[in-house]
Amino acid sequence: MTTRWPRSLSCLIVTALSSALLVGCGEDDDHGRSCSGRTGKDLSSRTVAGGDLWQKKLRCVNLERSTLTGLVSEANLRRGNLYAARLVGVSLENVDLRGADLRRVDLGSATLSQVDLRGADLSGARLDRGLLTDVSLEGAQLDTVELRAASLTHVGLNGADLVGADLAGATVSDSDLRGARLRDADISTTTWENVLCPDGSRSSARNSCADHPSRAESRAAGQFPAPSAALPDSP
């Protein structure tokens, strides 16, 4: 026996299912991460002058898809959401961006000085022609980041993930890349000046970090065997 639903009820069910599918698969999921259990100031999708952020404590601020202009100085934007924000040509000085979401951010030709980006996510970000000095990027996610023709001086990249990054024409000097992952990164035309390479060796005029990947990456590529397990002591 076939059960026949009233037409009004059938339409209601179809509408509900369609709405659920749109919510689950639509473009609304294309957003940055917000702080768990905490809501910061909402400055999303607008133009924000750097002076408005001067010396402000805006932890967990929402700057998603916003355009920042001018100089941003002495601001605490820790764990902020800057997903797909536009900061082209902006100057960042003494800014705390630890743990921030900067995926797909555009920092082309920007100047960063004494900026703390430890643990931040800059996947797919653009920093081409950027000037980075005294910047902390330890443990940051930088996969597929664009750093073409950028200048990096006194930059900490210990343990950073630079898989698939583009550093063509970039200059890296007096920086620390120990433990950084550079698999599939374009570093064929990168200049290395007094840099601690991923494997701990130091670059020189004849010694490029392109030839000194981290030990984990070298083992994965079969360049040298993994350390053998210790044998138990004889009774």
Regions found by a protein language model. Give the residues of each.
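C-terminal "tail" modules appended to repeat-scaffold proteins
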Residues: M1-T2, P235
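Bacterial N-terminal signal peptides that target proteins for export
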Residues: T2-I13
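Serine residues within intrinsically disordered or low-complexity segments
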Residues: S8-S10, S18, S228
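N-terminal processing/targeting junctions
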Residues: T15-S19, L231-D233
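C-terminal motif of bacterial Sec signal peptides marking the signal peptidase cleavage site
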Residues: L21-G24
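Tandem repeat scaffolds
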Residues: G26-S234
